[in-house]
A protein has these predicted regions:
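N-terminal subdomain of nucleotide-sugar transferases
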Residues: 1-66, 70, 100, 475, ...
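Nucleotide-activated donor-binding/catalytic signature segment of Leloir-type glycosyltransferases, i.e.
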Residues: 80, 268-296
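Carbohydrate-associated surface elements
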Residues: 161, 185
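Aromatic "clamp/platform" in nucleotide-sugar-dependent glycosyltransferases that forms part
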Residues: 313
Length: 484
Protein backbone atom coordinates (compact mmCIF):
# COMPACT_ATOMS: atom_id res chain seq x y z
CA UNK A 1 0.00 0.00 0.00
CA UNK A 2 1.49 3.33 -1.02
CA UNK A 3 1.68 6.02 1.62
CA UNK A 4 -1.50 8.06 1.81
CA UNK A 5 -1.49 11.85 2.00
CA UNK A 6 -2.09 12.91 5.63
CA UNK A 7 -3.20 9.47 6.81
CA UNK A 8 -4.99 9.52 10.20
CA UNK A 9 -6.23 6.74 12.47
CA UNK A 10 -9.98 6.22 12.23
CA UNK A 11 -10.65 7.30 15.82
CA UNK A 12 -8.76 10.57 15.28
CA UNK A 13 -10.47 11.59 12.04
CA UNK A 14 -13.03 14.32 11.53
CA UNK A 15 -16.42 13.01 10.44
CA UNK A 16 -18.16 14.81 7.58
CA UNK A 17 -21.86 14.65 6.73
CA UNK A 18 -22.00 14.69 2.92
CA UNK A 19 -25.27 15.97 1.45
CA UNK A 20 -25.49 15.16 -2.26
CA UNK A 21 -26.58 12.36 -4.58
CA UNK A 22 -26.20 8.81 -3.30
CA UNK A 23 -22.49 8.20 -3.96
CA UNK A 24 -23.35 4.80 -5.44
CA UNK A 25 -25.25 6.47 -8.28
CA UNK A 26 -23.74 7.18 -11.70
CA UNK A 27 -24.78 10.84 -11.86
CA UNK A 28 -22.02 13.41 -12.23
CA UNK A 29 -22.54 14.54 -8.63
CA UNK A 30 -22.68 10.95 -7.36
CA UNK A 31 -19.50 10.04 -9.25
CA UNK A 32 -17.52 13.03 -7.98
CA UNK A 33 -18.88 12.53 -4.45
CA UNK A 34 -17.73 8.92 -4.53
CA UNK A 35 -14.25 9.88 -5.74
CA UNK A 36 -13.93 12.41 -2.92
CA UNK A 37 -15.06 9.90 -0.29
CA UNK A 38 -12.81 7.07 -1.51
CA UNK A 39 -9.83 9.35 -2.03
CA UNK A 40 -10.06 10.88 1.46
CA UNK A 41 -11.33 7.90 3.50
CA UNK A 42 -7.90 7.56 5.14
CA UNK A 43 -8.23 11.12 6.47
CA UNK A 44 -11.95 11.71 7.05
CA UNK A 45 -14.87 9.54 8.16
CA UNK A 46 -17.99 9.99 6.03
CA UNK A 47 -21.76 9.80 6.37
CA UNK A 48 -23.58 10.38 3.07
CA UNK A 49 -27.24 11.36 3.10
CA UNK A 50 -27.68 10.13 -0.45
CA UNK A 51 -30.38 11.87 -2.42
CA UNK A 52 -32.42 10.32 -5.23
CA UNK A 53 -35.95 10.34 -6.64
CA UNK A 54 -38.12 7.62 -5.06
CA UNK A 55 -35.09 5.83 -3.63
CA UNK A 56 -35.93 2.13 -3.07
CA UNK A 57 -33.66 1.97 -0.01
CA UNK A 58 -34.77 5.26 1.55
CA UNK A 59 -34.23 5.41 5.30
CA UNK A 60 -31.78 2.52 5.59
CA UNK A 61 -28.23 3.05 6.80
CA UNK A 62 -25.70 1.07 4.76
CA UNK A 63 -22.12 0.53 5.87
CA UNK A 64 -19.90 0.89 2.79
CA UNK A 65 -16.61 0.71 4.69
CA UNK A 66 -15.54 -2.72 3.47
CA UNK A 67 -16.13 -1.79 -0.16
CA UNK A 68 -14.31 1.53 0.29
CA UNK A 69 -11.39 -0.26 1.96
CA UNK A 70 -10.93 -2.39 -1.14
CA UNK A 71 -11.13 0.54 -3.54
CA UNK A 72 -8.95 2.85 -1.44
CA UNK A 73 -6.48 0.11 -0.47
CA UNK A 74 -6.84 0.83 3.24
CA UNK A 75 -8.13 -1.18 6.19
CA UNK A 76 -10.05 1.16 8.48
CA UNK A 77 -12.39 3.46 6.56
CA UNK A 78 -15.68 4.54 8.10
CA UNK A 79 -18.19 5.29 5.35
CA UNK A 80 -21.96 5.05 5.70
CA UNK A 81 -24.72 5.89 3.24
CA UNK A 82 -28.31 6.71 4.16
CA UNK A 83 -30.40 6.78 0.96
CA UNK A 84 -33.11 9.45 1.00
CA UNK A 85 -35.88 10.81 -1.19
CA UNK A 86 -34.61 14.22 -2.21
CA UNK A 87 -31.62 15.96 -0.68
CA UNK A 88 -32.87 16.08 2.89
CA UNK A 89 -34.79 18.35 5.24
CA UNK A 90 -34.23 19.99 8.64
CA UNK A 91 -35.57 17.06 10.62
CA UNK A 92 -33.36 14.38 9.08
CA UNK A 93 -30.27 16.61 9.32
CA UNK A 94 -30.98 17.33 13.00
CA UNK A 95 -31.42 13.60 13.62
CA UNK A 96 -28.15 12.73 11.87
CA UNK A 97 -26.26 15.45 13.74
CA UNK A 98 -27.65 14.16 17.04
CA UNK A 99 -26.83 10.49 16.33
CA UNK A 100 -23.70 10.63 14.15
CA UNK A 101 -22.19 13.82 15.62
CA UNK A 102 -20.40 14.99 12.45
CA UNK A 103 -17.68 17.62 12.66
CA UNK A 104 -18.82 19.38 9.48
CA UNK A 105 -21.36 19.33 6.66
CA UNK A 106 -20.27 19.26 3.01
CA UNK A 107 -22.93 20.05 0.41
CA UNK A 108 -22.67 19.59 -3.34
CA UNK A 109 -25.17 20.67 -6.05
CA UNK A 110 -27.26 23.71 -7.05
CA UNK A 111 -27.88 26.11 -4.12
CA UNK A 112 -31.64 26.05 -4.71
CA UNK A 113 -31.71 22.51 -3.32
CA UNK A 114 -30.22 23.79 -0.05
CA UNK A 115 -32.44 26.77 0.77
CA UNK A 116 -33.88 24.87 3.74
CA UNK A 117 -30.34 24.19 5.00
CA UNK A 118 -29.21 27.79 4.57
CA UNK A 119 -32.27 28.88 6.57
CA UNK A 120 -30.96 26.87 9.55
CA UNK A 121 -27.30 27.76 9.07
CA UNK A 122 -26.98 29.61 12.39
CA UNK A 123 -28.30 26.59 14.25
CA UNK A 124 -25.71 24.40 12.51
CA UNK A 125 -22.76 26.79 12.51
CA UNK A 126 -23.02 27.34 16.27
CA UNK A 127 -21.29 23.97 16.46
CA UNK A 128 -19.91 22.83 13.10
CA UNK A 129 -18.91 24.46 9.79
CA UNK A 130 -20.66 24.19 6.44
CA UNK A 131 -18.46 23.49 3.40
CA UNK A 132 -19.88 23.94 -0.10
CA UNK A 133 -18.52 22.36 -3.28
CA UNK A 134 -20.22 24.76 -5.66
CA UNK A 135 -20.51 25.79 -9.27
CA UNK A 136 -22.36 28.45 -11.24
CA UNK A 137 -22.92 28.35 -14.97
CA UNK A 138 -22.61 31.97 -16.05
CA UNK A 139 -22.73 35.70 -15.39
CA UNK A 140 -23.99 38.28 -14.54
CA UNK A 141 -22.75 37.43 -11.04
CA UNK A 142 -25.79 35.99 -9.20
CA UNK A 143 -26.26 38.52 -6.41
CA UNK A 144 -29.40 36.56 -5.50
CA UNK A 145 -27.03 33.80 -4.30
CA UNK A 146 -25.33 36.05 -1.74
CA UNK A 147 -27.26 34.71 1.30
CA UNK A 148 -26.32 31.17 0.27
CA UNK A 149 -22.62 31.90 -0.06
CA UNK A 150 -22.68 33.85 3.21
CA UNK A 151 -24.10 30.76 4.94
CA UNK A 152 -20.93 28.74 4.27
CA UNK A 153 -17.50 28.73 5.87
CA UNK A 154 -15.63 27.23 2.92
CA UNK A 155 -16.49 27.57 -0.77
CA UNK A 156 -14.82 25.05 -3.05
CA UNK A 157 -15.24 26.45 -6.56
CA UNK A 158 -15.29 23.83 -9.32
CA UNK A 159 -14.44 26.32 -12.09
CA UNK A 160 -12.31 29.46 -12.27
CA UNK A 161 -15.48 31.31 -13.21
CA UNK A 162 -17.23 30.08 -10.05
CA UNK A 163 -14.35 31.23 -7.83
CA UNK A 164 -14.56 34.68 -9.41
CA UNK A 165 -18.34 34.71 -8.96
CA UNK A 166 -18.08 33.68 -5.29
CA UNK A 167 -15.67 36.56 -4.66
CA UNK A 168 -17.71 39.13 -6.61
CA UNK A 169 -21.01 38.19 -4.96
CA UNK A 170 -19.61 38.15 -1.42
CA UNK A 171 -17.75 41.43 -1.85
CA UNK A 172 -16.08 42.49 1.42
CA UNK A 173 -17.32 39.33 3.12
CA UNK A 174 -15.15 37.18 0.86
CA UNK A 175 -12.18 37.89 3.15
CA UNK A 176 -13.97 36.00 5.94
CA UNK A 177 -14.35 32.86 3.82
CA UNK A 178 -12.00 30.25 2.43
CA UNK A 179 -12.57 30.24 -1.34
CA UNK A 180 -10.47 27.83 -3.38
CA UNK A 181 -10.46 26.51 -6.95
CA UNK A 182 -11.17 22.75 -6.98
CA UNK A 183 -11.79 21.40 -10.50
CA UNK A 184 -13.41 18.03 -11.06
CA UNK A 185 -10.95 15.15 -11.07
CA UNK A 186 -11.25 11.97 -13.14
CA UNK A 187 -10.11 8.58 -11.89
CA UNK A 188 -7.33 7.62 -14.29
CA UNK A 189 -7.69 3.97 -13.30
CA UNK A 190 -11.02 4.05 -15.14
CA UNK A 191 -10.38 6.53 -17.97
CA UNK A 192 -7.23 6.11 -20.05
CA UNK A 193 -6.03 5.66 -23.66
CA UNK A 194 -6.34 2.14 -25.08
CA UNK A 195 -3.63 1.71 -27.70
CA UNK A 196 -2.38 -1.41 -29.50
CA UNK A 197 0.05 -2.22 -26.70
CA UNK A 198 -2.66 -2.10 -24.01
CA UNK A 199 -3.91 -5.42 -22.53
CA UNK A 200 -7.52 -4.38 -23.25
CA UNK A 201 -6.90 -3.62 -26.92
CA UNK A 202 -8.65 -6.76 -28.17
CA UNK A 203 -11.67 -5.94 -26.00
CA UNK A 204 -11.57 -2.45 -27.45
CA UNK A 205 -11.60 -3.79 -31.03
CA UNK A 206 -14.56 -6.07 -30.28
CA UNK A 207 -16.47 -3.27 -28.56
CA UNK A 208 -15.76 -0.87 -31.44
CA UNK A 209 -16.93 -3.44 -33.95
CA UNK A 210 -20.18 -3.87 -32.03
CA UNK A 211 -20.80 -0.13 -31.57
CA UNK A 212 -20.10 0.67 -35.22
CA UNK A 213 -22.03 -2.37 -36.45
CA UNK A 214 -19.07 -3.80 -38.35
CA UNK A 215 -18.61 -0.57 -40.31
CA UNK A 216 -15.39 1.39 -40.72
CA UNK A 217 -15.35 5.17 -40.29
CA UNK A 218 -12.59 7.71 -40.88
CA UNK A 219 -13.88 10.25 -38.35
CA UNK A 220 -16.12 9.78 -35.30
CA UNK A 221 -17.66 12.55 -33.21
CA UNK A 222 -18.94 11.73 -29.70
CA UNK A 223 -21.54 13.42 -27.49
CA UNK A 224 -22.06 12.25 -23.91
CA UNK A 225 -24.53 14.35 -22.00
CA UNK A 226 -28.20 14.73 -21.16
CA UNK A 227 -30.80 15.70 -23.71
CA UNK A 228 -31.88 18.94 -22.03
CA UNK A 229 -32.29 22.41 -23.47
CA UNK A 230 -29.11 24.04 -22.14
CA UNK A 231 -26.97 21.21 -23.57
CA UNK A 232 -27.90 22.36 -27.11
CA UNK A 233 -28.10 18.78 -28.36
CA UNK A 234 -30.16 19.70 -31.42
CA UNK A 235 -27.58 22.33 -32.34
CA UNK A 236 -24.92 19.62 -32.12
CA UNK A 237 -26.83 17.45 -34.59
CA UNK A 238 -27.40 20.42 -36.90
CA UNK A 239 -23.70 21.34 -36.68
CA UNK A 240 -22.73 17.81 -37.64
CA UNK A 241 -25.09 17.87 -40.63
CA UNK A 242 -23.55 21.18 -41.78
CA UNK A 243 -20.09 19.67 -41.37
CA UNK A 244 -21.13 16.77 -43.62
CA UNK A 245 -22.22 19.27 -46.25
CA UNK A 246 -18.85 21.04 -46.00
CA UNK A 247 -16.84 17.90 -46.75
CA UNK A 248 -19.23 16.48 -49.34
CA UNK A 249 -21.38 13.38 -49.43
CA UNK A 250 -18.73 10.79 -50.23
CA UNK A 251 -16.40 11.81 -47.39
CA UNK A 252 -19.36 12.27 -45.04
CA UNK A 253 -20.38 8.65 -45.59
CA UNK A 254 -17.15 7.69 -43.84
CA UNK A 255 -17.94 9.82 -40.78
CA UNK A 256 -20.32 9.26 -37.85
CA UNK A 257 -21.79 11.14 -34.90
CA UNK A 258 -22.58 9.01 -31.83
CA UNK A 259 -24.75 10.55 -29.12
CA UNK A 260 -24.84 8.72 -25.79
CA UNK A 261 -28.05 10.21 -24.46
CA UNK A 262 -31.78 9.69 -24.06
CA UNK A 263 -33.18 10.57 -27.50
CA UNK A 264 -36.55 11.72 -26.15
CA UNK A 265 -36.64 13.76 -22.94
CA UNK A 266 -39.31 16.14 -21.67
CA UNK A 267 -36.55 18.47 -20.48
CA UNK A 268 -35.04 18.49 -23.96
CA UNK A 269 -36.62 17.41 -27.21
CA UNK A 270 -37.29 14.51 -29.57
CA UNK A 271 -33.89 13.91 -31.16
CA UNK A 272 -35.27 11.21 -33.44
CA UNK A 273 -37.46 13.89 -35.02
CA UNK A 274 -34.52 16.29 -35.22
CA UNK A 275 -32.41 13.67 -36.98
CA UNK A 276 -35.22 12.80 -39.40
CA UNK A 277 -35.83 16.45 -40.28
CA UNK A 278 -32.21 17.56 -40.67
CA UNK A 279 -30.12 14.53 -41.59
CA UNK A 280 -30.19 12.66 -44.88
CA UNK A 281 -29.40 9.06 -43.86
CA UNK A 282 -27.66 8.52 -47.21
CA UNK A 283 -24.60 10.42 -45.97
CA UNK A 284 -25.28 11.97 -42.52
CA UNK A 285 -24.65 9.16 -40.04
CA UNK A 286 -26.14 10.06 -36.66
CA UNK A 287 -26.50 7.24 -34.13
CA UNK A 288 -27.92 7.14 -30.61
CA UNK A 289 -26.32 5.08 -27.86
CA UNK A 290 -29.16 4.37 -25.44
CA UNK A 291 -27.93 1.37 -23.43
CA UNK A 292 -26.59 2.01 -19.96
CA UNK A 293 -22.81 1.84 -20.15
CA UNK A 294 -20.46 0.71 -17.42
CA UNK A 295 -17.48 2.96 -16.77
CA UNK A 296 -15.16 0.60 -18.66
CA UNK A 297 -17.43 0.74 -21.71
CA UNK A 298 -17.67 4.52 -21.54
CA UNK A 299 -13.88 4.70 -21.51
CA UNK A 300 -13.86 2.63 -24.70
CA UNK A 301 -16.40 5.00 -26.29
CA UNK A 302 -14.07 7.94 -25.75
CA UNK A 303 -11.27 5.86 -27.26
CA UNK A 304 -13.40 5.13 -30.33
CA UNK A 305 -14.02 8.85 -30.87
CA UNK A 306 -11.76 11.27 -32.72
CA UNK A 307 -13.29 14.22 -30.89
CA UNK A 308 -15.87 14.87 -28.16
CA UNK A 309 -18.22 17.80 -28.76
CA UNK A 310 -20.12 19.85 -26.15
CA UNK A 311 -22.01 22.97 -27.27
CA UNK A 312 -23.96 23.76 -24.08
CA UNK A 313 -25.19 27.34 -23.78
CA UNK A 314 -24.87 27.07 -19.98
CA UNK A 315 -22.36 24.64 -18.51
CA UNK A 316 -20.81 24.73 -15.07
CA UNK A 317 -18.02 22.33 -15.97
CA UNK A 318 -18.67 19.74 -18.71
CA UNK A 319 -17.53 16.42 -17.24
CA UNK A 320 -17.61 14.63 -20.62
CA UNK A 321 -14.83 16.93 -21.83
CA UNK A 322 -12.63 16.04 -18.86
CA UNK A 323 -13.24 12.33 -19.37
CA UNK A 324 -12.38 12.81 -23.03
CA UNK A 325 -9.15 14.64 -22.23
CA UNK A 326 -7.82 11.98 -19.87
CA UNK A 327 -8.44 9.32 -22.53
CA UNK A 328 -6.39 11.35 -25.00
CA UNK A 329 -9.30 12.46 -27.19
CA UNK A 330 -9.60 16.01 -28.55
CA UNK A 331 -12.51 18.28 -27.60
CA UNK A 332 -14.75 20.85 -29.29
CA UNK A 333 -16.67 23.09 -26.92
CA UNK A 334 -18.66 26.28 -26.68
CA UNK A 335 -16.69 28.93 -24.81
CA UNK A 336 -18.74 29.27 -21.65
CA UNK A 337 -18.58 28.35 -17.97
CA UNK A 338 -16.12 25.73 -16.81
CA UNK A 339 -15.59 24.40 -20.32
CA UNK A 340 -13.23 27.36 -20.77
CA UNK A 341 -10.90 25.93 -18.12
CA UNK A 342 -10.51 22.73 -20.10
CA UNK A 343 -9.49 24.55 -23.27
CA UNK A 344 -6.71 26.38 -21.39
CA UNK A 345 -7.06 29.88 -22.81
CA UNK A 346 -3.77 31.65 -22.28
CA UNK A 347 -2.02 35.00 -22.66
CA UNK A 348 1.66 34.80 -23.61
CA UNK A 349 1.59 31.14 -22.64
CA UNK A 350 0.13 31.71 -19.15
CA UNK A 351 -3.23 30.10 -18.33
CA UNK A 352 -5.64 32.97 -17.78
CA UNK A 353 -7.39 33.83 -14.53
CA UNK A 354 -10.78 35.51 -14.34
CA UNK A 355 -11.44 38.85 -12.63
CA UNK A 356 -14.27 41.40 -12.38
CA UNK A 357 -12.71 43.22 -15.36
CA UNK A 358 -12.31 39.99 -17.33
CA UNK A 359 -15.00 37.65 -15.99
CA UNK A 360 -15.13 35.30 -18.98
CA UNK A 361 -13.61 34.66 -22.38
CA UNK A 362 -17.03 34.03 -23.94
CA UNK A 363 -16.70 37.22 -26.00
CA UNK A 364 -13.59 35.85 -27.70
CA UNK A 365 -11.05 38.40 -26.45
CA UNK A 366 -8.34 35.74 -26.10
CA UNK A 367 -7.78 33.26 -28.90
CA UNK A 368 -4.67 31.41 -27.66
CA UNK A 369 -5.64 27.98 -26.30
CA UNK A 370 -4.53 24.40 -25.80
CA UNK A 371 -3.95 22.57 -29.07
CA UNK A 372 -6.15 19.67 -27.90
CA UNK A 373 -9.22 21.91 -28.08
CA UNK A 374 -11.15 23.63 -30.86
CA UNK A 375 -13.22 26.39 -29.23
CA UNK A 376 -16.49 27.69 -30.63
CA UNK A 377 -17.20 31.23 -29.46
CA UNK A 378 -20.82 32.23 -28.77
CA UNK A 379 -22.47 34.17 -31.56
CA UNK A 380 -25.24 35.41 -29.28
CA UNK A 381 -25.16 36.26 -25.58
CA UNK A 382 -28.62 36.95 -24.21
CA UNK A 383 -30.10 37.06 -20.72
CA UNK A 384 -32.42 34.28 -19.60
CA UNK A 385 -33.88 33.70 -16.15
CA UNK A 386 -36.69 32.55 -13.90
CA UNK A 387 -38.12 33.84 -10.60
CA UNK A 388 -35.59 31.86 -8.47
CA UNK A 389 -32.69 32.79 -10.80
CA UNK A 390 -33.78 36.15 -12.28
CA UNK A 391 -30.91 36.60 -14.72
CA UNK A 392 -28.16 34.53 -16.31
CA UNK A 393 -26.39 34.80 -19.64
CA UNK A 394 -27.32 32.26 -22.28
CA UNK A 395 -24.19 31.83 -24.42
CA UNK A 396 -25.33 30.30 -27.69
CA UNK A 397 -22.90 29.37 -30.41
CA UNK A 398 -23.95 29.09 -34.04
CA UNK A 399 -24.15 25.56 -35.49
CA UNK A 400 -22.31 26.79 -38.60
CA UNK A 401 -19.36 27.83 -36.40
CA UNK A 402 -19.37 24.43 -34.70
CA UNK A 403 -19.41 22.82 -38.16
CA UNK A 404 -16.27 24.79 -39.06
CA UNK A 405 -14.64 23.58 -35.83
CA UNK A 406 -15.47 20.00 -36.79
CA UNK A 407 -13.95 20.63 -40.21
CA UNK A 408 -10.71 21.90 -38.64
CA UNK A 409 -10.39 18.81 -36.46
CA UNK A 410 -11.29 16.53 -39.38
CA UNK A 411 -8.64 18.07 -41.63
CA UNK A 412 -5.91 17.54 -39.03
CA UNK A 413 -5.80 13.85 -39.89
CA UNK A 414 -5.76 10.93 -37.48
CA UNK A 415 -2.07 11.13 -36.49
CA UNK A 416 -2.22 14.83 -35.63
CA UNK A 417 -5.50 14.39 -33.73
CA UNK A 418 -3.89 11.61 -31.72
CA UNK A 419 -0.84 13.76 -30.98
CA UNK A 420 -2.96 16.70 -29.84
CA UNK A 421 -5.19 14.43 -27.79
CA UNK A 422 -2.13 13.05 -26.02
CA UNK A 423 -0.94 16.60 -25.27
CA UNK A 424 -4.36 17.30 -23.77
CA UNK A 425 -4.13 14.16 -21.64
CA UNK A 426 -0.67 15.10 -20.35
CA UNK A 427 -1.90 18.55 -19.40
CA UNK A 428 -5.15 17.33 -17.81
CA UNK A 429 -3.41 14.84 -15.52
CA UNK A 430 -0.47 17.15 -14.80
CA UNK A 431 0.28 19.57 -11.99
CA UNK A 432 -1.16 22.65 -13.70
CA UNK A 433 -4.66 21.43 -14.59
CA UNK A 434 -4.97 18.78 -11.83
CA UNK A 435 -8.04 17.20 -13.43
CA UNK A 436 -7.48 13.82 -11.74
CA UNK A 437 -9.19 12.24 -8.75
CA UNK A 438 -5.83 12.01 -6.97
CA UNK A 439 -5.19 15.74 -7.35
CA UNK A 440 -8.78 16.60 -6.45
CA UNK A 441 -8.90 14.55 -3.25
CA UNK A 442 -5.54 15.81 -2.05
CA UNK A 443 -6.83 19.37 -2.51
CA UNK A 444 -10.05 18.49 -0.66
CA UNK A 445 -8.00 17.34 2.34
CA UNK A 446 -5.83 20.48 2.29
CA UNK A 447 -8.73 22.93 1.98
CA UNK A 448 -11.08 21.23 4.44
CA UNK A 449 -8.29 20.91 7.01
CA UNK A 450 -7.80 24.65 6.61
CA UNK A 451 -11.55 25.09 7.07
CA UNK A 452 -11.57 23.09 10.29
CA UNK A 453 -8.55 24.99 11.64
CA UNK A 454 -10.07 28.42 10.95
CA UNK A 455 -13.67 27.66 11.96
CA UNK A 456 -15.17 30.04 14.50
CA UNK A 457 -18.59 28.98 15.84
CA UNK A 458 -21.34 31.51 15.28
CA UNK A 459 -22.81 33.08 18.40
CA UNK A 460 -26.33 32.11 19.40
CA UNK A 461 -27.53 35.58 18.42
CA UNK A 462 -26.24 38.92 17.16
CA UNK A 463 -27.49 42.50 17.27
CA UNK A 464 -27.99 44.35 14.01
CA UNK A 465 -28.75 47.96 13.33
CA UNK A 466 -31.75 48.11 11.03
CA UNK A 467 -30.83 50.02 7.89
CA UNK A 468 -32.03 50.20 4.33
CA UNK A 469 -30.76 47.29 2.30
CA UNK A 470 -28.22 48.26 -0.36
CA UNK A 471 -29.22 47.90 -3.99
CA UNK A 472 -28.07 44.70 -5.62
CA UNK A 473 -26.05 46.15 -8.48
CA UNK A 474 -23.67 44.22 -10.73
CA UNK A 475 -20.13 45.52 -10.12
CA UNK A 476 -18.20 43.65 -12.79
CA UNK A 477 -17.86 44.31 -16.49
CA UNK A 478 -20.68 43.04 -18.69
CA UNK A 479 -19.11 44.11 -21.99
CA UNK A 480 -15.78 45.60 -23.13
CA UNK A 481 -13.74 43.21 -21.00
CA UNK A 482 -10.07 43.97 -20.39
CA UNK A 483 -7.45 41.36 -19.52
CA UNK A 484 -4.27 42.55 -17.84
Amino acid sequence: MKEKFRCIKQEDRKKILLLCDDIRMHSGIGTMGKEIVIGTAHHFNWFNLGGAVKHPQAGKVLDMSEDVNKQANIEDSSVKVMPYNGYGDPKIVRDIIRVEKPDAILIFTDPRYWVWLFEMEREIRKSIPIFYLNIWDDYPAPLYNRPYYESCDVLLAISKQTKNINEIVLGDKAKDKIIEYLPHGINTDYYFPVKESHPDYNKFKEFKKKVLRDKEYDFIVFYNSRNIRRKSTSDSIFAYRLFCDLIGKEKAKKCAFILHTQPVDQNGTDLYAVREALCDPEYVNVYFSTDKLETAQLNLMYNIADVTMQLSSNEGWGLALTESLVTGTMIIANVTGGMQDQMRFSKDGKWIDLTPDFPSNHRGDIKEHGEWAEPVFPSNISIAGSPPTPYIFDDRCAPKDAAKALLKVYELGSEERERRGEEGRKWAIGNEAKFTAEHMTKSVIEVLDKGFDSFKPRPAYEFYKIEDLPRKVINHKLIDYSYE
